[in-house]
Amino acid sequence: MLDTKFDELMEFPCSFPYKVVGDASETLADRVVAVVQKHVPGDYVPSSKVSSKGTYNSITIRVTVQSKEQVESLYIDLAAIEGVKRVL
């Protein structure tokens, strides 16, 4: 796991925003939702934005997380998606 202080800074459960930045792809949002569904099943409608040159997409999704471990494992799994450059 990651060495974070989420448990010291946040009260769980809480709504947590993830921003996933990756190569421009029509399927990036679907792949992000699929990963989130494995951890926290639910109905998600992520917002998407294309960079000014069309090179990258950013997907923002809010997830109700239950623990520090859930926040961290989502960071790890979202970063493992093919084409993802950053998870914020």
Swiss-Prot record:
SUPFAM superfamilies per the UniProt record, alphabetical: YbeD/HP0495-like
InterPro entries per the UniProt record, alphabetical: UPF0250_YbeD-like (IPR007454), YbeD-like_sf (IPR027471)
Cellular component GO terms held in the UniProt record: cytosol
Family from the record: Belongs to the UPF0250 family.
Protein name listed in UniProt: UPF0250 protein Swoo_3713
Organism: Shewanella woodyi (strain ATCC 51908 / MS32)
